[in-house]
Amino acid sequence: SSEVSQLLVSAYPAAHPAYLTEMYSDNTDEQMHSTWSAFDRFQEQAYQWKDIDEVRNAETPYQLWEAHYTAVATANEAIAHINSVNNAHDYDAQLGEALLCRAFAMFQLSTVFCQAYDKTTAQNNLGLAYPTEPEKVVGRLIERGTLAQLYNNIEKDLLQGLELVGTKYARPKFHFTKQAAY
C-alpha cells in the first residue's frame, strides 16, 4: 500500500489556475504609464482576454489542461491497481484519496474550461471528458458529455472518496485526509 501512496503524490495537479483566473478577474488593472509593461506575454494575453498561445508558463490553459488530466490519469492507475488486488479493502484509504484527487482535478478543470454551473442550464452546457480508467489505447476519444454529467461524476467520486479516505498519513501535508478533504 505504500507504493500506491507514493504514486498518489503524482495525482495532485502540478499546476493551479490561481494566476490565470486572477488575470481574468476585476482584481487586475492596467497601469497606463509609459514605464509599465506586462510581466510576460501570457499575463498580457490573459489580462486582455485574448486567445492564449503562450505555453511555457505553468498556468497557461494548455499547462493547466495537461497537469490536471495527468493527475486524473495517475488517480485512474491507482484505482485500477487497487481494484485488481485480492486485498483491496486494505487500500480503502488510498482508494478514497485517488477518488478525491480525480474529483478535485476535474472540478478545477471545470472552473477554467466550462460555463459556471447552473442547474437550469447544466443539461445543455458542455462538460468535459471524465476518464475513469487508465488509457490503454492512444488517441481514444472519451465523450465530453454535459456539465450536469460532469458534476454528477465529480460528486460521485467526492462522496465515495470521503467515505473511504483515512484520517492519518505518514506525511499528511501531501495527501488528502478526511480532515483536509472537508
Predicted regions and their residues:
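Acidic, glycine-rich segments characteristic of secretory precursors and extracytoplasmic regions
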Residues: 1-28
